[in-house]
Amino acid sequence: MQQNGDPRRTNRIVRYKPLDSTANQQQAISEDPLPEYMNVLGMIFSMCGLMIRMKWCSWLALVCSCISFANTRTSDDAKQIVSSFMLSVSAVVMSYLQNPSPIIPPWVTLLQS
């Protein structure tokens, strides 16, 4: 009971076709918008911290830029990430250089009255 022929079914063989790398990259970018959202939020909070001198906005900007950096890919632009970090760090530094008193949470004034 020995078979001399090839037992594999040639009509069932499916050849490997590599996917287009640019299409995969575009699909991966559109799947996760979190770094871009955090970058925009970081910029907004940095501007609020610099212009309105709100210390908690400056710290939120730093947190948002850290989250944005943690979720970025290697294909993303490094200049945008560095500028976001520099803006948020400068907001924290400037808010404490202008007024070195400790941060007062906004809800403290609501609890006192």
From Swiss-Prot:
Membrane-protein topology: Single-pass membrane protein
Gene Ontology terms: biological process: protein insertion into ER membrane
Record GO cellular component, one term: endoplasmic reticulum membrane
InterPro entries membership: ASTER
Entry keywords, A to Z: Membrane, Transmembrane, Transmembrane helix
Transmembrane segments: 81-97
PANTHER family: CGI-140, PAT COMPLEX SUBUNIT ASTERIX
The protein, known as: Protein Asterix
Organism of provenance: Caenorhabditis elegans
